[in-house]
Amino acid sequence: MATAAAASNKFESFFETTLEDADPEIFGAIRNELGRQRHEIELIASENIVSRAVLEAQGSIMTNKYAEGYPGKRYYGGCQFVDVAEELAIERAKKLFGCNFANVQPNSGSQMNQAVFLALLQPGDTFMGLDLNSGGHLTHGSPVNMSGKWFKVVSYGVRKEDHLLDMDAIEKTAHETKPKLILAGGTAYSRIWDWKRFREIADAVGAYLMVDMAHIAGLVAGGVHPSPLPHAHVVTTTTHKSLRGPRGGMILCNDEDIAKKMNSAVFPGLQGGPLMHVIAAKAVAFGEALKPSFKVYAESVAANAKALASSLKETGLDIVSGGTDNHLMLVDLRPKNATGKRAEAALGRANITCNKNGIPFDPEKPFVTSGVRLGTPAGTTRGFGQAEFREIGKLIAEVLDGLKIANSDEGNAAVEAAVKAKVVALTDRFPLYPYLG
């Protein structure tokens, strides 16, 4: 009896011991990260803040279940309830974006794009993608990425005079190189994409049109940016960023044959068992995005971006392409004699989080850069409006002006401390996850 009682107590401990007691080091890191998120202004364009419901789904017992395959066609038993979660995620994604097919299993943005390449291309095939220096992504053909190693990549870019896509030049290049696939979309392009023109170019050369809308999916869902689904053969998107869900990816399309190829490419082509706790959280996020309040959110994200860009321009900074039509902007720091590396560090010391980013035709090295990329999704989720983002623009300028005076990597401690105090006062007005204590 004593042995049985001891065994029972051991298992009770396993199931009931809190993270704080079981692993104080990880618990401490999580609490510190919560404090950072609460007291810093998050301007990284690819980041957002999920709801309590999404957190609960992602932290659920769904993490225990293996479910190789697809709903109704699994290689494991006991999948009847995870099937419900995945089917809900699929149906909600289809409704949200008005498409016929959705694969919600990709674990990341890189994997969703790899799946499309696996489905539609052969090694050595030619595809076109936006150059990294013009706002593209590593998976759009960068030579250091699989996409640039396995395929012949023809990059297109923006015009030097206005930093906008030159559709005539893209069309000319497509006719000259005859790509099998044209990839539209990017991570640092702040203007509206002309999906219709891209499809016309693709059709003229017999290419697939693939759109990576990872950054703007939330704006598409909210009706703020035109949808690529009526035009593209296949669309990929992450489920976080402006869509405000858990970190992951998905693939959307309207053609049944392409959908079958995508499903085979994801599983068994690239992945094994899907992350069912993440898929459950995706379903929750898609359900949130289907509510009328999400349209208001998306509209606010875009309006706040315009307010921030306008405020920054008033302080003497340049915005690449002159402004923004979506959630992000590239800020040219050269008017303040700053580099992206120095600015990111100085702003970080003032509790403003962003990332250094190259600008088109940047003379600086990739780890230095002449710019920073800023975005409004996380701040908008928190409750910031246009007034707050105009204030944030001024705070950024204060830090950069102090940095210009100091002219060193160490920055201007007095200015940064003063701005940090203002940032904390602002964030305290918009509490984050108060139920966590």
Curated annotation (Swiss-Prot):
Keywords: Amino-acid biosynthesis, Cytoplasm, One-carbon metabolism, Pyridoxal phosphate, Transferase. It catalyses: (6R)-5,10-methylene-5,6,7,8-tetrahydrofolate + glycine + H2O = (6S)-5,6,7,8-tetrahydrofolate + L-serine. It comes from the Bacteria. Its EC number is 2.1.2.1. This is Serine hydroxymethyltransferase 1. PROSITE patterns: SHMT. GO terms for biological process: glycine biosynthetic process from serine; tetrahydrofolate interconversion. Catalyzes the reversible interconversion of serine and glycine with tetrahydrofolate (THF) serving as the one-carbon carrier. This reaction serves as the major source of one-carbon groups required for the biosynthesis of purines, thymidylate, methionine, and other important biomolecules. Also exhibits THF-independent aldolase activity toward beta-hydroxyamino acids, producing glycine and aldehydes, via a retro-aldol mechanism. It is an enzyme of class 2 (transferase). GO terms for molecular function: glycine hydroxymethyltransferase activity; pyridoxal phosphate binding. The keyword Transferase applies. The record marks 240 as: Plays an important role in substrate specificity. NCBIfam families: PRK00011.1. Its cofactor is pyridoxal 5'-phosphate. It comes from Mesorhizobium japonicum (strain LMG 29417 / CECT 9101 / MAFF 303099) (Mesorhizobium loti (strain MAFF 303099)). Its main location: cytoplasm. The modification N6-(pyridoxal phosphate)lysine is found at residue 241. It is found in: Cytoplasm. Pathway: One-carbon metabolism; tetrahydrofolate interconversion; Amino-acid biosynthesis; glycine biosynthesis; glycine from L-serine: step 1/1.
